[in-house]
Amino acid sequence: MAKKTIDQIDVQDKTVLMRVDFNVPLDESLAITDDRRIRMALPSIKSVIDRGGKVILMSHLGRPTGGEGDEKYSLAPAAKRLGELLGSTVHFATDTVGDDASSKASSLAAGEVLVLENLRFNPGEKKGDSEFAGKLAAMADAYCNDAFGTCHRKDASMVAVPEAMAGKPRVVGHLVAKEIQYLTDAISKPERPFVAILGGAKVSDKINVINNLLGICDAVLIGGAMAYTFSLASGGKVGKSLVEKDKVELAKELMAKGGDKLQLPVDTHCGDDFGNIAGCNKKVVAAGEIPDDMEGLDIGPETAKKYAEVIKSAKTIVWNGPMGVFEKPPMDEGTKAVAQAIADGDAVSIIGGGDSAAAVDQLGFADDVSHVSTGGGASLAMLEGQAFAAVDLLDEA
């Protein structure tokens, strides 16, 4: 699956149309609260401008329902922040394929950067529209995909644009190359023991991942609220815990398939008031023994200890989804114990994006793991064994 990278093509005086992921959080005053995604795109952008090329950046931000002009979904703050990080002027177009974008794209000089307005302001983006894609494609001499977070999607900028640029160089950026290498290596040639840790709320979100990983991993450790659906499937009492009753039969099938590989919590940290975790009645009970007026909120200390032992012996670890309500202490203890065990070990550790990436960051372990993925949905899709059309059609290395 190795693809040609941005560093491997000639960009001198050429225009590169680069799909990035600038889907950054903004506060009420439209200030960026976390610019990590912009910073992660810098190596690919610099690869072009430092070699005398021109860059046109395209991205989505949020899920706008109206047309252009809804400033809370505008990429203007991202363009401004990028200029600060690069220490140079970054041009911004108020549309994607309109007059402003066209005139600014055609007047770009070598070493300059243009950010187009939010792709999703145009309905053609989500529809994968070829006419919209053709207008974007016409602006450039080469295409670069550096948006791993949307690699599993078939949006116009991900698939129809590179299709429209057949015959021109179509490559991956640094970020996508790194993501694919880590995740592909983990799945296809892991150093063993290979352990997967899966948390989060819903079994339904992770069915295909659990299924695929049970065939590849030496152990699959389950935490988060989805553990309560497994508990219910084993005949346990789950109280008021979040469960998917329509997925109980499926949980039984996964337990039968997984056997000893599929490890479930042995105890649970529960409480009686989700809205006031600090002040709720908290107690640790055996798994499957949650009182009727309580709900499970985290794995218990025995489970944390048991999982830490498995993690310490691992050589490859994939973690997707927290063990409990990590954003509400003390229900962060299970997630913290897992993060600590990963940080203390010497395994190749890959943290799936989304909540697990936020947890690792919040708990201060981001520098102690091998790789924190930038794409929650995309990393899950790769762990399911899905092929990505957006990557498959790019040039082979």
UniProtKB/Swiss-Prot annotation:
InterPro entries membership: Phosphoglycerate_kinase, Phosphoglycerate_kinase_CS, Phosphoglycerate_kinase_N, Phosphoglycerate_kinase_sf
Substrates-to-products reaction catalysed: (2R)-3-phosphoglycerate + ATP = (2R)-3-phospho-glyceroyl phosphate + ADP
Enzyme Commission number(s) from the entry: 2.7.2.3
Residues where substrate binds: D21, F22, N23, R37, H60, L61, G62, R63, R120, R153
Gene Ontology process terms (BP): gluconeogenesis; glycolytic process
Database matches in PROSITE patterns: PGLYCERATE_KINASE
Keyword Transferase belongs to the record: yes
Pathway: Carbohydrate degradation; glycolysis; pyruvate from D-glyceraldehyde 3-phosphate: step 2/5
Residues the entry annotates as binding ATP: K206, G296, E327, G353, G354, D355, S356
Subcellular location(s) per record: Cytoplasm
Key word Nucleotide-binding present: yes
Family: Belongs to the phosphoglycerate kinase family.
Protein name stated in the entry: Phosphoglycerate kinase
